[in-house]
Amino acid sequence: MRIEFTIPVNPRPKKNSPMILWRKQDFKIKIGARILATIPFTPFIVPSKGFSDFENEIMPFLKRLKDEAGVIDYPCNIQAVYYRSTKHTIDLTNLNEALHDAMVKSGLIIDDNRDIIAAHDGSRVFYDKFNPRIEIIITELKDYIQWNDTTTEQIKLL
């Protein structure tokens, strides 16, 4: 099986400038069993606004693709060619992670572990100032051995 599609968004990495927020809940600083201090707020990390905006832009495309192609629960190669609107230094690994996390959140793929996303062969980053986009080709890998039976795992999730 081969699925090809283009998403007309400017790709954003997930790990750029995450925000640290505080939740109103006791946070204990410990060494062993001994509590050194108690702070009335607990820190937690959320993705940057840029990534949240990217995820909101990409989600309708991924959900529509899931409705058309179904859920991917088999080993596949996800080739993603990213066209960015700027020439800023960018990490391909972080772009892939952002895309894969969005694919899981949309329900298009059941997980982004090695049993499902077995390869990223052919992924690249290019510059296109006037037409930023992500061109994606998902190809099923027939000769790949999964460590876990993902179809059984998927049934458990439903």
Predicted regions and their residues:
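Acidic, proline/glycine-enriched N-terminal capping motif
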Residues: 1-158
